[in-house]
Design a protein with these regions (language model features):
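Catalytic cores of secreted or luminal carbohydrate-active enzymes
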Residues: 167-203
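Hydrophobic or amphipathic alpha-helical targeting/insertion segments
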Residues: 129-134
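DPxDG-like acidic metal-binding loop motif
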Residues: 139-140
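Cysteine-based protein phosphatase catalytic domain of the PTP/DSP
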Residues: 2-123, 135, 145-157, 166-170, ...
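Phosphate/adenylate-binding glycine loop and adjacent helical scaffold
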Residues: 126
Length: 362
């Protein structure tokens, strides 16, 4: 029995898969093919009409994960049937995750919606092409938060297995599961913590230490470049982000080449202020081809940093598919932080989303 039929008490409407009672996922999200525009619109009309026939007294809320700012065809069609649509971005600085404030918003809204109208409301999940990696994380978060599935790693893997083999690799050049699991563990703490999420700490990201040199060239070495993306906590720009740090911007001298034969440890000084959701990328500069190759990526939230250090091995990093052999046994990346006492911890930023409130959101 697959995960999406585990709570299957009756046949769901055509075009939908049942995740839980009155919670459905559009089956187009699992397709590897592009549905022609005309067929796609017909498909949406038929699905929503059948839903209305099956649940005539229900209100419908659809979470849509998409790219861009324009109103989507999905939203335009669902509005015709008096449904409420909430649009979310399908990535955060290239990582198929949402910032913690949006995850909190999603959990709160879905919970309130399902509890409304004497538990008659219906929740729908939809993603536009390319949005499956994030949708898989969102579905796992929903299952963990509502205690419909246990074990963060097992739940995340089970949801990803529902998609056709190779879909995740097709849509994401890096394996996003390590960062997704980290954020799923954040979500799981909501069920046991009286304050969730905790205040986002303002920290100084002091340095990154690589222990045992990964092999990214013919000399078993690398020229590491660090880039850091996040929210500028000195502005009132809400969820907007930008590059906070880049090795290339800071250093005018040529990047140093580190080889396994010469050293065991690389220490890269950064001294960058961070707060909230942060994406840290480490790239290798290949001088032969004059291009940058992604070594690893990690996304984290400063609210959950303990003892001012984030310790990661190859299993905890988002890396290119089939590249684990580049990281020797015992490889470790350490991200060291310092306190920034001049800035007070703040709550997550105000969430501003594209929402059509037909009937109003809770």
């Amino acid at each position: 029995m697959t995960l999406l039929s585990r709570f299957f008490y009756r046949r769901p409407p055509d075009g939908l898969l049942e995740l839980a009672d009155r919670v459905y996922v559009f089956d187009s999200c699992f397709s590897t093919e592009v549905i022609p525009d005309g067929l796609y619109q017909m498909y949406l009309h038929e699905v929503i009409m059948e839903l209305h026939e099956e649940f005539p007294n229900s209100s419908f809320l659809a979470f849509n994960f998409r790219e861009g700012e324009k109103q989507s065809k999905f939203a335009q069609i669902l509005y015709q049937y008096d449904a409420t649509v909430v649009d979310y971005p399908r990535q955060y600085e290239g990582c198929p995750l949402l910032p913690l404030s949006l995850i909190q918003h999603f959990l709160r809204v879905s919970d309130s919606w399902l509890a409304g109208q004497n538990h008659q409301n219906v929740v729908l999940f939809h993603c536009e092409r390319g949005g499956w990696p994030l949708l898989a994380f969102i579905l796992a978060s929903f299952l963990i938060y509502r205690k419909l599935h246990s074990g963060e790693a097992r739940t995340l893997e089970a949801v990803h297995r529902e998609a056709p083999k190779g879909l995740l690799q097709l849509l994401s050049p890096l394996n996003p599961l390590p960062s997704q699991l980290r954020y799923l563990q954040y979500v799981a703490r909501r069920n046991i913590s009286p304050e969730w999420p905790p205040p986002e700490r303002a920290l100084s990201l002091d340095c990154v230490i690589l222990r045992i040199i990964p092999s990214f060239d013919s000399e078993n070495g690398c020229r590491p470049i660090i880039r850091i993306f996040g929210r500028d906590f000195q502005t009132q720009s809400g969820l907007s982000t930008h590059m906070l740090f880049s090795t290339c911007r800071k250093k005018k001298a040529p990047l140093k080449h580190y080889r396994q034969a010469d050293c065991d440890v690389i220490k890269i000084d950064i001294q960058c202020l961070v707060q909230g959701d942060v994406v840290l990328e480490c790239l290798h500069l290949d001088l032969e081809t004059d291009r940058q190759v992604m070594m690893f990526r990690v996304m984290f939230n400063t609210a959950f940093i303990r003892s001012n250090i984030l310790m990661l091995n190859a299993e905890n990093l988002d890396i290119l598919w089939e590249s684990k052999e580049r990281y020797p046994k015992g490889f470790r990346a350490e991200v060291l932080f310092g306190e920034n006492e001049t800035i007070s911890p703040v709550k997550a930023p105000t969430t501003i989303l594209n929402v059509d409130e037909k009937g109003g959101l809770p």
